């Protein structure tokens, strides 16, 4: 989310009192639900759409509060022309097809991919927003949990280290 804020603060577009329209593809999952909460509570963001194939048509309820919006259905005819940003909160191997469609329909929209689909794609900016102040372009690939933890841990001492740094992470759940 802070990547979107940084992008708007540092972009050529002016930041005004107007709210920025943000859609979430994958709005019903855990991450999508948290994003809906963040967007709903932010004074400059407006939830344009939350897409979910599993609960399309159902009311969006956050912390027992109804948002007066319903989850939208996502299909090949869906258009993304009014959004300022679209967040892809989809599983790996699902986000790429929607990113291409969004780029063709709305070349100005910021696309934030939370999956691994674009992490090694040179057209996408791979960024830990807390460590990156400016972003060139509108395609942002969010690092995964291990990469984020390791980069944040290393950041304060990075200038004191000579040579190569290696990290090894193990999880009991994936």
Residue ranges and their predicted role:
Residues 2-174:
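N-terminal Rossmann-like NAD(P) cofactor-binding subdomain of oxidoreductases
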